[in-house]
């Protein structure tokens, strides 16, 4: 017997509360899939359960093959805000909205950026080692330093960049913002200094924190040429997306002493290969792309994802969360 229920694929990382928002409706059936499922297995699973009407994605790629396999896709939504793994033009051609979790993980990513700045400034790893290894007497040879009074350059002034600025202003830092899509008035109203020339601003910064999306415009933005513009005492923080920073160029700058250090939550290849050159540098701290995946953020993102799906199925998608509003 054919079911009239809408079939929704959800990744294993979706929270119980979010699942309940979907399953409490008698017109919805959910099918769970692994967060790190391979492309062939995902496509086969979609075909097996077709028609599939909605999908809540984690790290899984989604494009034309998956749309074809689904049969009757109505909405694709991410448990997150990045969508570089989704073929947006393919969705738009089929009039399928792509939705994201709005500001759900923005506080978490902003905290991670600040955490990385503080970890590097306060030399947390080195201080811990001195106590643990009994080299207390050498503590004055590697003094930590303050964020107070330092200059931060934020790249991208969206949901996360604005929150990072707010936190760093509270640390009494001077905050520069480069975002060609935001007005100087908006940036200044937030207590920051707007800069229109990235290359001219880089030599001024003690820290550079990247918060822009990964697009053709931003891929390779921090290459060897741009890294050379930074002060040798400066630090680079990337909690945005891998590929915005050219890792080979970053490694060369760090080894040559042209850059003081870096904090990386994202990488060109994820996971990065074991033994990757950056792994061996003492002035680099890393995290496995978890800046936006705190306990609280997962709950917020999951619930927003469920609401996105319901809004689309009910014919009124939450417009501010739609990446391709031209399909509406």
Q: How would you describe each model-predicted region?
A:
Residues 47, 63-64, 180-277:
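Rossmann-like adenosine-cofactor binding region
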Residues 28, 192-193, 283-284:
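Short, conserved active-site loop motifs that form the nucleotide-linked donor/cofactor pocket
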Residues 52-54, 75, 207, 235, ...:
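Short, Asp-centered acidic motifs that coordinate Mg2+ and/or phosphate
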Residues 157-158:
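Glycine-rich Rossmann-fold phosphate-binding loop(s) that bind the pyrophosphate
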Residues 94-96, 102-151, 163-166, 170, ...:
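Phosphate-binding beta-alpha-beta segment of Rossmann-like dinucleotide-binding domains, i.e.
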Residues 1-99, 203, 223, 229:
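An N-terminal-biased, well-structured beta-alpha scaffold segment characteristic
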Residues 94, 233-328:
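Rossmann-like dinucleotide-binding domain for NAD(H)/NADP(H)
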Residues 33-34, 79-80, 96-107, 179, ...:
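Short beta->alpha connector loops at strand-helix junctions that form conserved
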